[in-house]
Amino acid sequence: EAQQGNYMVFFPSYRLMQDVYEVFAGKAADSCEILMQHSNMKEHEREAFLEEFEKERQGTLVAFCVMGGIFGEGIDLKNDRLIGAIIVGTGLPQVSDEREILKNYYDERGLSGFDYAFRYPGMNKVLQAAGRVIRTSEDRGVILLLDERFLQREYGALFPREWEKRSVCGLPQLREEVSRFWSDVREEL
């Protein structure tokens, strides 16, 4: 509501994305257009999904995507084609034998195995998803990180320097913070 435009919401899994989509679609279907990424999308389906961001619209488009998936990296939606990314979770990979071997390898060398096996790959997915919003120096957009772990020093140290001007707020203050951001952007222009 703070700013109409195109947004992507990135989830750590298809299951969580589907669960949130069902709730969101039931509550917001009348106030915005909603898209959802599907597993095994064919090329023409991917193209049709991205073409939705090229359309001129009066309202808001909200696209549900999987972090680290086909829309989380390698797509260029410049200018006002994408004005916001909402990132749910820290992108940590699932625990697996491969991840445990990697973690143990770095732990045995006196390094943080958790960082190398989990935190760094997860943050790479987060940064890739966030990077869909700002593609040129003229682009402006909002990036919402929805996970309290982002407040930890270990995660904050991995943020790009451009993120130094950031706000931390709870859900009750979110609308006000996002409105303030867009008001500041309009004043810049």
Locations of regions flagged by a protein language model:
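ASCE RecA-like P-loop NTPase motor cores
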Residues: 1-189
